[in-house]
């Protein structure tokens, strides 16, 4: 997927996407990603999984915004339409509260969930 947007037709068709993907790194697992980010930022990132359910270590958007304001490196973990693998929730430091809406149904397309979460965390 990344190669499509970095070389050939994809890169020509959408050069700004190519530019955005220049900072992308493909990692094998969460531990490798945490090691890389720890080396890069000099501090272990706080890992925050996302999903459609609450967990015992769930935190709200306001709490996470507070951590971000402290300048802590934070690694947000998003899954596919099927969610994250169970072990990721166990390994993560926190799980972000699910995106709530009207009623009990809260399953969103991943793109939509990411957009809503980022807006709630970094919008002014």
What are these regions (language model features)?
Residues 15-22, 77, 98, 102:
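Residue-level detector of alpha-helix boundaries and kinks
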Residues 31-35, 55-56, 102-105:
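A short acidic, often aromatic-flanked loop/helix-cap motif at beta-alpha or helix-coil junctions
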Residues 1-52, 115-123:
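RNA substrate-binding interface of SAM-dependent RNA methyltransferases
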Residues 44, 71-72, 92-93:
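Short, well-ordered alpha-helix to beta-strand connector turns
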């Amino acid at each position: 997927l990344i190669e499509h947007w970095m070389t050939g037709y994809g890169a020509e068709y959408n050069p700004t996407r190519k530019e955005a993907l220049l900072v992308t790194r493909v990692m094998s697992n969460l531990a490798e990603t945490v090691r890389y980010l720890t080396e890069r930022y000099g501090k272990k990132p706080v890992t925050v999984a996302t999903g459609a359910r609450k967990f015992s270590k769930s935190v709200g958007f306001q709490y996470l915004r507070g951590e971000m304001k402290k300048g802590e490196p934070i690694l947000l973990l998003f899954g596919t339409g099927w969610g994250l693998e169970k072990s990721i929730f166990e390994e993560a430091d926190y799980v972000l509260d699910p995106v709530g809406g009207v009623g009990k149904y809260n399953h969103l397309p991943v793109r939509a969930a990411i957009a809503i979460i980022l807006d709630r965390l970094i919008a002014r």
